[in-house]
Amino acid sequence: MSNDSTTAKLGCVIALAAAWAVAPPAAAAAPLDAVVEQLVLEAEAANLELAGAEQGVAQRLAVLDQARARFLPALDLGMRYSMADGGRQIDIPVGDLLNPVYASLNSLLAASGQPAPFTPIDNVSVPFLREEELQAVVSLTQPVYDARIPAAKRAAEHEYIASRQGLDALRVRLRRDMQQAWFRWLALRESAAVLDASLEAARENQRVNESLHRNGRVTRDLVLRAEADVLEIEQQLEATNGAQRIARNYVNLLRNQPLEAPLPEAAVSDADVARRRDALVRQAGGVARDRGWLQDTAVERRQELRQIDSGIEAAGAAEDLARAAFRPQLALAVDAGVQSEELGFEGDENFVLASLVLRFNFYNGGADRAALREARARSGELLAARDLAEQHVRLEVLESVKDFEVAEASLRTAAKRVAAADGAFGIARRKRDLGQIAQVEFIDARRAVTSAQLNQQVNRFQALSALAAVEYAVGGPVRSAPPPETGP
């Protein structure tokens, strides 16, 4: 084997490997947008955190139903049948009181020749407990005035609305997290493909140098250098494959699938970044780079802020609830039933009792005033949290837009870097074929191509992840066109 033919063969192998590394994914891969929407829908349907939040909304709705029910009358049925033996006796001295009177009357009547009609009577002893007693009562209670009831209803309504807005905010965050997790997995997959191609080329270079060394054409240092090059790429590939598995596990965690389940693939290019950027610009009415408008839009659309707003309204209702303790409560109560010594619902034992019940608390140790202070402090806490959250949202918009601009610029630079590295590698390959370049310089040229390709893959998916962050920062996908731009 001649040195020229061997190096020419090596050049062909490395060139083919480099071409394979930068080749686009297979045509069978699905379009990017379709796969993104598929994964988002799967996550929204099965994500465990989202399912828990939905149950939280159902809980707040049940609390609201309870608050509404307090406006309606309460109807209760109570029945009691008792048997008693013994117990206290109530002694009534009827005989002691009336018998002397009866005796005097009988004497007067006898003196006038009339019969004595009055007979002595015994004292009466009444048992405190009846031997048998049946009591059945139907009670109807209707609040007439109670300031606590409407205040509690308003608080429950706003808490329910806040829980729904929190659920919507979680959906938007889940959409961002799913996109970014999947883009990270794609980036690692593409990086592994580049490293695989580079590893094959490095192994071929090692085999060629070992053959040349056996034939006495090169020294041992070139063989060791080629071996070190292979080991370096293997180490990088092992780390990349491990990170790829972790990224896949996280995507499957978000969509509640087995962690090792395969993920859908998609063909991704720089054109996809530009297309998704333009789509976001169109959704924003052509003012996606207007940071002021984006900040105002985010403040208007972010469900986290709406959730805090509803919490503030609920805290205001809680203040009204605390103030209601200083007002009277008036209720209507109607009881209808029977109290009898025998089983049955007939006779004179039936009764109906209607009452207006007024309750007003004058003093309970200052607990009501403390509850009012607590409610006011809660309102103040939420107002401060609302201002802080709005500042965070505005800052998040600025950071996400800036991150995308940096990623977009880096992507353009990465494309130029790949072109420059490819050109330099082509020149190095021709010099190598002419025997005008050292082996170490040729390996460095190959490394430059690999590094440029890896950098391009990373920047491409970083740009897509940054776009997902911008979409999240402004409140998710814009469903309707915004007002026309008025700022500069």
Residue ranges and their predicted role:
Residues 3, 165, 169-297, 400-403, ...:
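Periplasmic alpha-helical coiled-coil/stalk elements that build and connect Gram-negative outer-membrane
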Residues 11-23:
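Bacterial N-terminal signal peptides
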Residues 40, 52-67, 170, 174-195, ...:
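Amphipathic alpha-helical coiled-coil segments
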Residues 2-13:
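Bacterial N-terminal signal peptides that target proteins for export
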Residues 27-89, 94, 133, 142-143, ...:
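Bacterial Sec-pathway N-terminal export signals of envelope proteins
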Residues 38, 133-135, 180, 225, ...:
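Transmembrane beta-barrel architecture of outer-membrane proteins
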Residues 30-32, 78-138, 269-287, 320, ...:
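Small/polar, glycine/serine/threonine/aspartate-rich low-complexity segments that form flexible
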Residues 41-51, 58-75, 121-130, 137-155, ...:
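A glycine-/polar-enriched beta->alpha junction
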